[in-house]
Amino acid sequence: MSRTDYAFESLPISDRAKRAKAAGADLLVSIHGNSAENPNANGARVYYNADTSFSKTAESKLLATAMAEEIDRLCPSSTATSTVDGSNLAMLNGTGNIPSVLVETCFLTNEADARNALSEEWQDRMAEAIADTISATAKGICTKD
């Protein structure tokens, strides 16, 4: 856990994976709110590192898929189904042998998603979906090389 309170810490994205590695993390889950120029963009997105040279691509994809399914189950949205995307995002690069995903919980630039994000019930369900997925899948994918 890199934050334990609401204090904002400006840590460059390139350093976040390094911090996880230095801490001996078994898993990296980075949680964000998304935005887009198109106000119709909506729903959750779960990204994993699809670079074939990354040693934990399969484990990361498994975690991302399970996470998207659990988000859809616990946070049904009238806006969109969660999607999983293999990507080359800076946040997911440099994680070495740590399975890692980036969760964009919603699009804050979409009116319906933003309304959901303000709901304490929705926040609790999203947190539960993420925590349940970590708990259910971590044992099977968190093995050090």
Segments from the language model and where they lie:
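Catalytic-core regions of hydrolytic enzymes
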Residues: 1-63
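Stable alpha-helical elements in mature extracytoplasmic
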Residues: 12-16, 59-63, 67, 122, ...
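Solvent-exposed polar/charged
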Residues: 21-22, 73, 94
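Glycine-rich loops and low-complexity Gly/Arg-rich segments
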Residues: 26-28, 53-56, 70-73, 126-130
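Active-site-adjacent mobile loop/cap segments within catalytic or ligand-binding domains
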Residues: 30-38, 47, 80-145
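Active-site-adjacent substrate-binding region
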Residues: 58-85
